[in-house]
Amino acid sequence: MKYILVTGGVISGIGKGVIASSVGTILKSSNLHVTSIKIDPYINIDAGTFSPYEHGEVFVLDDGGEVDLDLGNYERFLDIRLTKDNNLTTGKIYQSVINKERKGDYLGKTVQVVPHITEAIQEWVMRQALIPVDEDGIEPEVCVIELGGTVGDIESMPFVEAFRQFQFKARRENFCNIHVSLVPQPSATGEQKTKPTQNSVRELRGLGLSPDLVVCRCSTPLDTSVKEKISMFCHVEPQQVICVHDVSSIYRVPLLLEEQGVVDYFRQRLDLPIGRQPRRLLMKWKEMADRYERLLESCSIALVGKYTKFSDSYASVIKALEHSALAINHRLEIKYIDSADLEQETLQEEPVRYHEAWQKLCSSDGILVPGGFGVRGTEGKIQAIAWARKQKKPFLGVCLGMQLAVVEFARDVLDWKDANSTEFNPKTSHPVVIDMPEHNPGQMGGTMRLGKRRTIFHSQNSVMKKLYGGHEYVEERHRHRYEVNPELRRELEARGLKFVGQDTEGERMEIVELEDHPYFVGVQYHPEFLSRPIKPSPPYFGLLLASVGRLSQYIERGCRLSPRDTYSDRSENSSPDAEIAELKLPMIDHE
């Protein structure tokens, strides 16, 4: 097993996750099996109870693990399936060690950070690195480990010490350290400054880890003189200083690393069995990056939510929209709308914000209401859904978005004026959305319906069934505490709101579609978690197709994209990558 540790310096949030994912991508393109581990030095057991403002979205895995959004990057880049143990936190490690101490496993010894915590970290990494993450079930050959935070933080000290020890346990030919650092370029002088990187590497080396590659994040390509200066002061060769400057899309990052000889370096440094033949996967990434820059037409989607000021709160949703837009060769324009701005209260207090929000909504090609929690902004979301339904505007509701679509329909079409979710009004006389029996209101963490679940289609004419390739069932990831009230299903369906997908018991409403509408779909699960750059999520793909007026044509063609639909350059000589043109949908295992 080969281990590649990715650390960061100067500031957090400089792209360690994308760089770690890109390293994994170029290794996977060399026919290696790659897995990833993300280490978060916070004391929380997992990311499940985080506020989206605090830490971005909570990414959900097949096994129900609520983890850091960087694991979403790993899954999308590498097309792998991770588990909750691929996200290691200080809380998990301390909980594990304390449980052992309570059982008497340490035989009365004084339990300390060194050696007990550090050894537990190493054991966790070695154990998890061997778990297969690819569909073929083959054991990984390379494990890319991202250490969150910045070097020197008090929180990350036990992890840095653990890897200082681990480099000797794994042996030099099996362990490599990539250090990601910022090279700022003040606008006043325009000069690239190396001092922050020098100090960061010096601190890392003082803690016992010496970087093999120094990856410099900068706004423009590094000057040769700057590379040489970093090389001299950071104790590395000039070819070990890698520049990752700002690029048009993240699809360019693996290509940037490959161009600078990172694969050749790993071949020698880690003695990896990598040939010199052209790498087909990277050719696909290059094709995607080139296509992204050639897009001529655009499609606007209104994202109506309550966390719109912080785009990381909807990271996977945004990626799923981007994947779908790229598949039909349209540039995506997302219009972020705070749902509270659509409410009558805002009209009274801030009429300008109210009218600006409605102008954004009305001028969009499609509307998306993603998942969320809490009562704030829900009436605004319901107003947006009502507008989409009445104006025949393509609409997708995810999780809470689906629940509110049912609430809006019940209020307006069935004339149940007080219809609501018991989450927002426990005393409503028409509880259209109710809490599930499994829900434990006394405890927040891990009490939701989580992870991969099967949804059975109950309608042959369902648009969603066609978008999923005509399969009898699909398996998608869930994260919710509330569900549509199954007792009201018959009354809702009688008026045209069809529940075309249910769980395996037929009790939980999973997919809803509205009759006589171009595209009005709600899904209880979160399809964005399984969207991939070359395999867009069907619900999001349907929204984009409907928004550009091509959904009917796509379905008539047997759910296949024509070359004309998938290429922005309309010249006769253009021909798209066939593998992207004929859209790949997520693999479904039939037992």
Curated annotation (Swiss-Prot):
A GO cellular-component term linked to this record: cytoplasm
Name of the top EC class for this enzyme: ligase
Comp. bias (Basic and acidic residues): 562-572
EC code: 6.3.4.2
Annotated catalysed reactions: UTP + L-glutamine + ATP + H2O = CTP + L-glutamate + ADP + phosphate + 2 H(+)
UniProt GO molecular function: ATP binding; CTP synthase activity; identical protein binding
SUPFAM superfamilies reported in the protein's UniProt record: Class I glutamine amidotransferase-like, P-loop containing nucleoside triphosphate hydrolases
Source organism superkingdom: Eukaryota
Function as written in the Swiss-Prot or TrEMBL entry: This enzyme is involved in the de novo synthesis of CTP, a precursor of DNA, RNA and phospholipids. Catalyzes the ATP-dependent amination of UTP to CTP with either L-glutamine or ammonia as a source of nitrogen.
Protein name listed in UniProt: CTP synthase 1-B
Organism: Xenopus laevis (African clawed frog)
Source taxonomy: Eukaryota, Metazoa, Chordata, Craniata, Vertebrata
Gene assigned in the entry: ctps1-b
